[in-house]
Amino acid sequence: MTLELMRGNEAIAEGAIRAGCRFYTGYPITPQNELFEYMARRMPQVEGVFLQCESEVAGINMIWGAACTGTRAMTSSSGPGMSLMSEGLTTLAAGQLPCVIVDVTRAGPGLGRIAPSQSDYRQATKGGGHGDYHAIVLGPSSTQEMAELATLAFYLADLYRNPVIILMDGMLGQMMEPVDFDRVKSLPAPEKPWALKGKGDGPRKVVYAAPFDDPGLIQLNQELVEKYRKIEETEQRWEEVHMEGAEVAVLAFGSAARVALDAVQAARSEGWPVGLIRPITLWPFPRKALANLRRTVRAFLDVEMNAGQMQEDLERVIGPDLPIHHLGQGGGKIIYPDEVYEEIKRLAG
């Protein structure tokens, strides 16, 4: 086992390269610049393509072109840049083109600040652009997991021919931890008979940004709904910690889950009946992990570095019968374990 000490931004870039990413384009924006810089160094070493684009709008459309050829392609940005990419993202979904987008979130709204925040949750999990579409959204909580989820992201993108967003925040992006790349397994890409190869000696292939008539668009939407239904059924991922006998369930993702875990372990050591559920797929939301808890848990604590965006998804699963409390806020305010610990004691007492 060989461990490499690196930032989260670097780990996700190296994980992407080991997954077979050979096209990267992006525009500098904090707090994701280390990812951008790492790709600039590494892509030439693996005979890949690195392009610094003139804007996020240009970048996401370059991803469209690369994805049309079947190349594993990735871009990255942060909140304001993701907003600029929204038209390209919905067009990628309409064209059913696989790609990976990394969102290293910063505090908002507006231009915001580079302080860590989880305020892009709603934007990512509810699509991010116009139309009825979804991106698969993964939420890592460690540097090791960033590298591992990068490989999973490309696999899922190819499997479902769909954009995948890796949603993390500036704290995770800048955090340095050891990474064991022996655990980062590249998942093979499937055959892509739809991809444009430019050879001219085979059947004509066309990738459409949208159908040209109403019946075609209606049919596309029906196909997307069926695809998303399959993804929701088969791709829910989560981690459970100390949920045996838990009467209070803490729900948190990303860096907030690291904070919540410290508090849950401290409370458990003192006998408080509390456990943690950490969503790994933010979309599809891990409803299966929560549905049966209505019979055993008497309260939920949603811990997020935003105004409670994931709480809305939790409420849809749990319904009105059990109390759901939120701890946290946006604007770059970091949550501390003692805050979560005190809230756990209040709810469990």
Language model regions located:
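Conformationally flexible catalytic loops at phosphate/diphosphate-handling active centers
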Residues: Q32, R161-E240
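Redox- and metal-dependent alpha/beta enzyme cores, enriched for Fe-S-associated oxidoreductases
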Residues: E240-I277, W283-A289
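Glycine-/acidic-rich phosphate or pyrophosphate-binding loops and their flanking alpha/beta elements
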Residues: R7-A11, V225-V248, L261
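Thiamine diphosphate
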Residues: M1-G127, H134, H326, Y336-I344, ...
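Peripheral docking tails and interdomain loops at the edges
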Residues: E304-G349
